[in-house]
Design a protein with these regions (language model features):
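Recognition helix of helix-turn-helix/homeodomain-like DNA-binding domains
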Residues: 21-38, 63-65
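A short, Lys/Arg-rich alpha-helix, primarily the initiator
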Residues: 1-14, 90-105
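Short, charged recognition helix plus adjacent turn
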Residues: 58-87
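Short, contiguous, well-structured surface segments enriched in hydrophobic/aromatic residues
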Residues: 15, 19-21
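The alpha-helix within a helix-turn-helix
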Residues: 7, 18, 47
């Protein structure tokens, strides 16, 4: 999973993204260096921390070899809605919880 180009493109620091994604510092570092393969939820946590677009988030999910967001899936539809509106990780988790769906983190 190569997120370095996106970090540079968006002018973000890896340490800040890891913190905003609510990831363990070591695990987050290992994801960014490619030493660890993140779960779908971890990729989504990073996507929200980096404020990725839907296209960028799906590209990251594909690179991580997990399923892309599917608007026909209720949970994914809520996540897509939140991505489109630039919501924070906290906000998407609140929305998922409100609808009785599994949170991202």
């Amino acid at each position: 999973l190569s997120l370095k180009p996106l970090l540079q493109e968006k002018g973000l620091e890896r340490s800040r993204v890891v913190r905003m994604a609510d990831l363990n510092e070591t695990f987050g570092y290992q994801i960014f260096t490619g030493a660890r393969h993140p779960s779908r939820n971890k990729v989504l946590q990073i996507a929200f921390a980096m404020a990725l677009t839907l296209k960028e988030a799906n590209r990251a999910l594909t690179a991580a070899r997990v399923s892309v967001l599917n608007c026909k899936d209720r949970r994914d539809a809520i996540i897509i809605f939140c991505i489109d509106r630039g919501c924070s990780l906290q906000k998407v988790n609140e929305e998922l919880y409100r609808f009785g769906e599994e949170t991202v983190s």
